[in-house]
């Protein structure tokens, strides 16, 4: 060991001396004595390694308290951090899909703070059913006879098939054998549920007679799957639920439908493309309809099944139901969200998903123009900051071919180097509330459709 190396090692402080320094008192109060000591030991090991490899001290050795504070602050951040979603995808799966209404947030907080009547009947002091209140709401909204709640729509489809068709065949059009992401495919779900898939028709055309010819003594269900995350266009043919229900009645085979996204309102009244609604399928005579809680419905992640009472009873009594049931927080948020649908006149104001989807391009354009000047002044030395028209997408496999006119702020590096865009995007991801955009066509795009806290956004980007 050289004299210089020995000198560097001697400059490393003792942990006891650091802990008695006044700058460490607040750190010990905030993070605890044990964690601070653990980190100091780790940092001393790091410093010794740097000395050994490069014959120098790490820069942070000049201020140990500051480095400890920075590391522990970062460590204490939640893994689920709030972000500003300016990707242009409203229901972004990686960013948690639907934002919850304030009523849902308050309901969850209340359910977390105190015991609740999850499975307790106040009328007779007996045991209640956790789905009962929600089932009543869902029946009122959809016209169904009963309802069942599980933790997501994939679980809903699994339970629906396992409880009503295990060991038997389920007839599905080949054009509806969807994959919803993460290699989750309808044929795979059927195998897990113990069903046998009976494909009919072709990818682009399926006729009523295809279903008729497929039905045999081992057929349990005729199934429709809404292709919510893709669209087959051109020379196509598919039969709707009403026609399939009529055929099912003739052949004494129930019809079930997986709607996927599942909107409880006619979106066309808000200027959006229309999606099939559970209440329409219930009115058509479909026995069971499954859909998601956290997509177009705008609530928490949940799988909802509505339909005929005797069919729902089979789902409720199946062993999988307990494994897949929703917890009290999910049920609280979903109930509060569904209650908003009882006042449809205020829905676009109180339901964040609908509020964001229905923002007009003109309003977003005005917002973009308002923000452009201060951002151009701040970033203009390196980037051209412009207002550009763009198209938002709904996301989460909803309305896959439909786009919503919007406006974006774009940042284009003067030197054209893509590395500058990556650096800017990385810098914004390190903000107290990370700002998430997307890099495309030599620009960093910030689609403003989902920007509601404009002041906080500006304060962070102008620092």
Swiss-Prot record:
GO terms for molecular function: L-seryl-tRNA(Sec) selenium transferase activity. Its cofactor is pyridoxal 5'-phosphate. Keywords: Cytoplasm, Protein biosynthesis, Pyridoxal phosphate, Selenium, Transferase. It catalyses: L-seryl-tRNA(Sec) + selenophosphate + H(+) = L-selenocysteinyl-tRNA(Sec) + phosphate. Pathway: Aminoacyl-tRNA biosynthesis; selenocysteinyl-tRNA(Sec) biosynthesis; selenocysteinyl-tRNA(Sec) from L-seryl-tRNA(Sec) (bacterial route): step 1/1. GO terms for biological process: conversion of seryl-tRNAsec to selenocys-tRNAsec; selenocysteine incorporation. Its main location: cytoplasm. Its EC number is 2.9.1.1. It is an enzyme of class 2 (transferase). The modification N6-(pyridoxal phosphate)lysine is found at residue 295. It is found in: Cytoplasm. GO terms for cellular component: cytoplasm. InterPro entries: PyrdxlP-dep_Trfase, PyrdxlP-dep_Trfase_major, SelA-like, SelA_trans, SelA_trans_N_dom. Homodecamer; pentamer of dimers. Binds only one seryl-tRNA(Sec) per dimer. Converts seryl-tRNA(Sec) to selenocysteinyl-tRNA(Sec) required for selenoprotein biosynthesis. PANTHER family: L-SERYL-TRNA(SEC) SELENIUM TRANSFERASE (PTHR32328:SF0). Belongs to the SelA family. This is L-seryl-tRNA(Sec) selenium transferase. The lineage of its organism: Bacteria, Pseudomonadati, Pseudomonadota, Gammaproteobacteria, Enterobacterales. The gene is selA.
